[in-house]
């Protein structure tokens, strides 16, 4: 597989992409994934409407660092005019690609006609992608799911509409809205989409190891591999995938010392960005992910929920180690 590839004019060093995940892919975590070799980073999804209202919490999600390029910013919404207007207003922000969320399954998003609810309305998808791609010079992409139960969604046709409307790439999560993250991802539909369009196709769903990434590429022909849940607490997955695709060798999993140092570094970055009170609390979920499956991890998770300072966390990790 060719490692270097492009979305529009934006070149990536490798095909391994950090998926956009609410509450996960903030600036500190993106930077850690970049250091470990991610080819493209994606922000948390950001509401176009909230941007237009200059919502403080939303604006705080739009923080970038020069070291993280290339990075894709994901917005969600359902009003073509508003989304195009917002896209134009934020184009000067230092991101490289603008992605439109058409796959979020969360009820509060879907009930507003946003996220995966857009799959029910191909005409609206066409209007949104057309207006947004005309409003900005940066490449525009879309992330979709393969269906919405109860509606005759044809994901191949949706992908063609996205391409015809001016998108530079499409990311496909091989599950329907109702599946959320249950069951197996349907890679065959990703393959059919890849065969039907000429823009790059990014495969997403069930990729949790270098061998799974290789299998996805082999079975679908996809150009990019997007990793979501498997990267939580595991930014090393990008290092492992790059090494495997270039050498055929599997790297050993990180040692406890590596994990501990990553937790502490991640914590320092969170504190620097958000202050100690918020930073420590933000790290609680990450610590659970970093230590999942390890001996005494339940006790460590419990105790980490009680710490309120960096020093306390450092002592806890030294003691548990």
Where are these regions (language model features)?
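Glycine- and other small-residue-rich loops at beta-strand/loop junctions that grip anionic moieties
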Residues: 19-22, 75, 117, 121, ...
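Glycine-rich, positively charged N-terminal anion/phosphate-binding segment
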Residues: 2-6, 21-96
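Alpha/beta catalytic cores of nucleotide-metabolism and tRNA/nucleoside-modifying enzymes
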Residues: 1-4, 8, 12, 16, ...
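N-terminal small/glycine-rich loop or linker at the start of catalytic domains
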Residues: 3-17, 51-71, 104, 109-112, ...
């Amino acid at each position: 597989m060719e490692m270097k590839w492009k979305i529009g004019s934006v070149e990536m060093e490798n095909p391994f992409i950090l998926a956009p995940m609410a509450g996960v892919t903030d600036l500190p975590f993106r930077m850690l994934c970049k250091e470990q070799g991610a080819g493209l980073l994606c922000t948390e999804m950001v509401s176009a409407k909230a941007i237009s209202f200059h919502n403080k919490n939303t604006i705080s999600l739009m923080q970038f660092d020069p070291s993280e390029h290339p990075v894709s910013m994901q917005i969600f919404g359902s009003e073509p005019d508003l989304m195009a207007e917002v896209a134009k207003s934020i184009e000067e922000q230092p991101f490289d690609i603008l992605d439109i969320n058409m796959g979020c399954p969360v009820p509060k998003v879907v009930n507003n006609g946003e996220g995966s609810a857009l799959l029910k309305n191909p005409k609206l998808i066409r209007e949104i992608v057309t207006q947004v791609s005309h409003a900005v010079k940066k490449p525009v992409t879309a992330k979709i799911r393969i269906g919405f139960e109860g509606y005759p969604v044809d994901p191949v046709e949706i992908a063609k509409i996205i391409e015809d409307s001016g998108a530079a790439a499409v990311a496909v999560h091989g599950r329907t809205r109702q599946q959320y993250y249950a069951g197996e991802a349907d890679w065959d539909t990703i393959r059919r989409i890849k065969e039907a369009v000429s823009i790059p196709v990014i495969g997403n769903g069930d990729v949790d190891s270098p061998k799974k990434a290789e299998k996805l590429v082999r079975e679908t022909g996809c150009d990019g591999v997007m990793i979501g849940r498997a990267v939580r607490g595991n930014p090393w997955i990008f290092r492992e995938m790059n090494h495997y695709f270039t050498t055929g060798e599997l790297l050993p999993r990180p040692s406890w010392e590596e994990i501990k140092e990553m937790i502490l570094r991640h914590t320092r970055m969170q504190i620097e960005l958000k202050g100690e009170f918020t930073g420590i609390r933000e790290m609680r979920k990450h610590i659970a992910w970093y230590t999942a499956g390890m001996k005494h991890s339940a006790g460590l998770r419990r105790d980490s929920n009680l710490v309120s300072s960096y020093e306390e966390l450092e002592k806890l990790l030294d003691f548990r180690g």
